Each structure stands twice: as structure tokens, then as C-alpha cells.
Amino acid sequence: MINGRKTSPLPGHSGGLPELEARLARELTMLERPAKPWVPRSYLDRCEVLDVAVIGAGLCGLTALAALSFAGIDNIRAFDRAPSGREGPWVTSARMETLRTRKDLAGPALGVPSLTFRAWFEAQFGTRAYEEMTLIPREAWMAYMVWYRNVLALPVSNETNLVGLGLREDGLLALNFMGPEGPVEVVARRVVLATGLDGLGAPRMPDVAKTVSGRFVRHSGDVFDMSVWRGKRVAVVGAGASAMDNAAAALEAGAARVDLFIRRTDIPRVEKFGGVASLGMTHGYIGLPDADRWAFMVEAERTQIPPPRHSVLRVSRHENAFFHLGSPVLKLTEAGDTVEIETPKGHYPADLLIFATGFDVDFGRRPEFSALNDRVLLWRDAYQPPVGQGNDALGSYPYLGPAFEFLPKPGLSAAEAAAISRVHCFAYPAVPSHGKITSGIPAVSPGAERLAQGIARSFFVEDRARHFETFMSHAVAEITGEEWRDADAQDKIKEHTDG
């Protein structure tokens, strides 16, 4: 079913993908991708050190792996806690029917036409089905990402959860995982955190949410079965896309009623970044002075991103959906198996509250990143905004370098500082530093290429002695000396003979 219309794969569609994959292989060959491996291998106690460990194998993680591979960096691997085919939010916590992104964006294709979602979709369902599809169903996107991983042979270890990241004295990074067969230890030269929206923190829950038993409270990013709330009263706090998605999912699952409590007196209507979306913004934002980058982000936070129109209509079409504007939740009171919600406009009973209130960046709430806590430079450390433009949430985001690398706080030892700068944040918290590159599908390819090029540059500089040694010892002759005749030498031979 594609956007309300029953759609079947084309007859013989099993041959559609092989044909596409053959075309993709030819395109990659013509582009010389992946490039020839060039990074010298490193060893520790006779064990090979991984060049790049990528934490997360969702959209950003897979695109990062592909970009690194295309750049000739092949000693790489991603690790994801989810089973194969369930990485990212698409078939777990996401509750929208379709992606919010336009279907024609190139996404993670890295400039390769046959690697696009469109090519994958049309190979199976045809051009007409693609043209009739308005937006991409999230399940189809997940299937595409599985194909993307497989067709590029990207190395991923699933069901492998990071439990600790350590900074070694020699500048290497120690990673401790819990895998399906027990603990796993990995040492890497670089680490890329591709951990999504909550990649450096946890769901943001207002203090009022903590005043009642946890059995009444969920966050929109949690994975839970909405069907258990059939016939129940569900309250959703928030007005963004995830609030609408959760409200709609509850209604479609048979909730008796859904109340949306919205702090603002109106739902945001204008996506400010939509007015400047361009390759100029993608490539230029990183070059802006801090004051300008901060001004963009503060205004975006102030106005907020509106939910898609179709997401709001998905809720409002239900007669048992109720929007309460200008209604911040002031107090929650347990009353047996229900909770009473108090707002400035009244009291409302509910059986479940879903807070669609975003995510915080807080290393302290992620034990696996304890080595980074208070060692990574944050925006509040690097920039002092003018009066009236302060924003504590934005101030907690990492202040990143040009290749998404963390920058060390002043006062660290040389070894600590070096190790910190070898961890790269290719996740949502990179947005204040790099712009909307890691926030979704539209600019993920330019972002991954920036990441890969930066890591490649750092490897070459770090290994420069080994490269220079190779340069000096290279003695493969391109020509033998038999390809020409020295005219002057021939004249001298002739003179000697004539004499």
C-alpha cells in the first residue's frame, strides 16, 4: 500500500533489483568508488586497530560508512544495538505514516544516481507508482536502507551495544560493547557517533512529568505498543510533528479520546529554515561567525518547526481529538488508575500522558560517554550570546570542529585533548555547529562527505612520516630508457667514428 493505493511489485520484480544493482556497479566503477585503500594499518599488541568505529547504523551511520569507503578508508565498522533491519526510528519509535521529507531528494546516495531511493523504488514498482506516490512510507524507507547497506557491503555489527568509550594515553580510543555473545572490546583510531536525535543525551521531560508514577508517562521517542490504550484517554503534550504522530497513532489504535496540550497560543506555522534551504546554506553555514550561527539557531528555537499539514489533518479528522492551545501542563495528580491534568483552562482526566518534548544534550545521562563529560567544549564555553539571545538548551550542544570533531576544553592533558578530537559527532547535536546536515535526509550526503574528507585529511597528516617513507622508497620506473635517443650522444659517437 503506497499512500492509500494498493501497489504490488512489478511482474518479475525480483529481476528489477539485480538489473539496478548491475547498473549501480557500473556507475561505481566509472566513479572509482570505493577508492583504492590507502590508510596504513595500525596494530596494538599484534592486533589490528580499527581505523574508524561508527556508533549507530541508521541513516547517518550508514552514509558515513559509505562516504568513508568511497574515500578509500576501508578498515571501518559500524555497531548498532538494534537487530538488523530495525536500526533507526523508522519501524520502532516513529509513528508517522510517511516520511516528512520530499520523495525526490537524493538523500544518502552520495552523488550516485542508482543509489537513490527513487532508483530502488522504480526498479521494483515502476515509474508510474513513483509518480503517484506523494510521500515515502516509512516502512519502504527502512527497506531501502537495508538494501543500501547490503548493496554497498557496509560492515555492521548488530545487537552490539556500546557500554563504554575510553580515552587511551596513546591517543587511541577504547570501545567496550555488549554483543550477542558477550563483551566485545575494540580499539579504534577514530570514533564517529551517529546516534540520532538523542545521541548525546536523553528524552527531555519537564519536571511536572516526574510528579506521577512512571506507569502513566511515556516520551514520544519511546518504543511502546499503542494498541494497549484502546478505549483509553490519552494526553499528548506538545505541538510538533512527533506530537501529531503520536496523537494520530493513539486515535487510530482506538483511543477513546486524545487531548493535545499545547503551551503556545498557536501552533507554529512557518519553517524558517525552509526559506534558506539551498546548497549555499549546506556548504556555507559552517563558515559563518559564531554570532550568526547562534542567531539562526535561536530564532529557529523561538519560532519552532511546524508539524506537517498532513500530520495535523491526520489528527483533526477524528471527532475525539481535542486541541488545547495556551494550555501548559501546570500540575499532575494521580487518582487511582488515572491522572488529572491541570492547565490554565481546566482539569482533564487521562489514562496515559505522552510527552513530545524533544531531547536534551547531556553527557551525564549517558554512562557510556562518561569519558567525554566535562571534557568536550560546548557552545556555552565557546560563545557568549548578547543579552536577550541566551538559550540554555543550545548552550549545552557541543561546539564542533570542521569535520564534526569534538574540541577539547582548555586544561586537559595533551593526550586527553588529542583523544577527544578523534571523536566525531555525526548526529543531531551537530546542528548548531554545522547547520541542518545531520538532522535528517536532505543534506546527509554532503555532511557525510565533509566528515569523510576531514577524517581522511587527519589520517594523512597523522601518518605523514609513513607516507613520506613510501614516497622516498618508491622506485618503480615508468619508462626504461629505450623509448628515445639522445641526439647529442649520437653526434658524439659519429664525430669519434669520423675521426
Model-flagged regions — what are they?
Residues A82-A109, P268-G284:
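Conserved N-terminal glycine-rich FAD pyrophosphate-binding loop of Rossmann-like flavoproteins
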